[in-house]
Amino acid sequence: METATLIAISISGLLVSFTGYALYTAFGQPSQQLRDPFEEHGD
């Protein structure tokens, strides 16, 4: 394979991995530990 192809595949894989981790953190099991500042400051 060419170097440019390997670099493009690597960057794409990293981007997909980061997006998956961000979605898991936002909506998965760790999301229960996140605090909501709007809920804490109820008027």
UniProtKB/Swiss-Prot annotation:
Q: How does it sit in the membrane?
A: Single-pass membrane protein
* Annotated keywords: Chloroplast, Membrane, Plastid, Thylakoid, Transmembrane, Transmembrane helix
The UniProt entry lists the main location of this chain as plastid
Q: What is this protein called?
A: Protein PsbN
Example of a GO cellular component annotation carried by this entry = chloroplast thylakoid membrane
- Spans through the membrane: 5-27
Write out the function statement from the record.
May play a role in photosystem I and II biogenesis.
Question: Pfam families, from UniProt?
Answer: PsbN (PF02468)
Its annotated compartments are: Plastid, Chloroplast thylakoid membrane
Similarity annotation: Belongs to the PsbN family.
The question of whether Magnesium is a record keyword is answered with no
* Gene Ontology biological-process annotations: photosynthesis
Which organism was this protein described from? Phaseolus vulgaris
